[in-house]
């Protein structure tokens, strides 16, 4: 898969979580902040990143930088996805279903951020298993990256879309 040039995209960023993490040392606890950010252009490109620093703004900046390096392209059919899929990562499973126009984004928490920034306006989703934000986001992106349009499948098989759909 080729890397997506983020300089040509108008990316919007959304902060999903900021966690305070502690390292216990002899003199007490040392606190740092871990940020989780999703970026997307609302036109089929989305990515996520994590950043860790001693200050919150710096952690967010690092997370945004990381997210811009991990962009994926989402195949879309109008305002939804081509077919149903279950994204899996660790113990987190996310069911993604195409929806008819006007349905809106039916998703919870971190999954909603990913789907909205990808530009999907009509989609149903259900989070199964782990509810850890990072696992949910990774499962969603894994599912979105495995989607295929009917045209792409037909081309791979050397058939027309009409032959494929019967």
UniProtKB/Swiss-Prot annotation:
PANTHER family from the UniProt entry: MITOCHONDRIAL RIBOSOMAL PROTEIN S5
A GO-annotated cellular component: small ribosomal subunit
Function text: With S4 and S12 plays an important role in translational accuracy. Located at the back of the 30S subunit body where it stabilizes the conformation of the head with respect to the body.
Entry text on domains: The N-terminal domain interacts with the head of the 30S subunit; the C-terminal domain interacts with the body and contacts protein S4. The interaction surface between S4 and S5 is involved in control of translational fidelity.
Origin species: Bacillus pumilus (strain SAFR-032)
Protein name: Small ribosomal subunit protein uS5
GO biological process terms, semicolon-separated: translation
GO molecular function: rRNA binding; structural constituent of ribosome
Superkingdom of origin: Bacteria
Pfam families in alphabetical order: Ribosomal_S5 (PF00333), Ribosomal_S5_C (PF03719)
Boundaries of every S5 DRBM domain copy: 11-74
Quaternary structure and interacting proteins, as annotated: Part of the 30S ribosomal subunit. Contacts proteins S4 and S8.
Family label: Belongs to the universal ribosomal protein uS5 family.
This protein's UniProt keywords: Ribonucleoprotein, Ribosomal protein, RNA-binding, rRNA-binding
């Amino acid at each position: 898969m080729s890397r997506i040039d983020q300089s040509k995209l108008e990316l919007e960023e959304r902060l999903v979580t900021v966690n305070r993490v502690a390292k216990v040392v002899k003199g007490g606890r040392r606190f740092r902040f871990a940020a989780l950010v999703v970026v997307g252009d609302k036109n089929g490109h989305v990515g996520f990143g994590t950043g860790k620093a001693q200050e919150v703004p710096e952690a967010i900046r690092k997370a945004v930088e990381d997210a811009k390096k991990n962009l994926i392209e989402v195949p879309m059919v109008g305002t939804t996805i081509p077919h149903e899929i279950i994204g899996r990562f660790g113990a987190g499973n996310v069911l993604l279903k195409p929806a008819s126009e006007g349905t809106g984004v039916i998703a919870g928490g971190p999954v909603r951020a990913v789907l909205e920034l990808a530009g999907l306006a009509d989609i149903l989703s259900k989070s199964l298993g782990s509810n850890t934000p990072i696992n949910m986001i990774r499962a969603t992106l894994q599912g979105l990256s495995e989607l295929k349009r009917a045209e792409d499948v037909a081309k791979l098989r050397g058939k027309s879309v009409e032959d494929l759909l019967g």
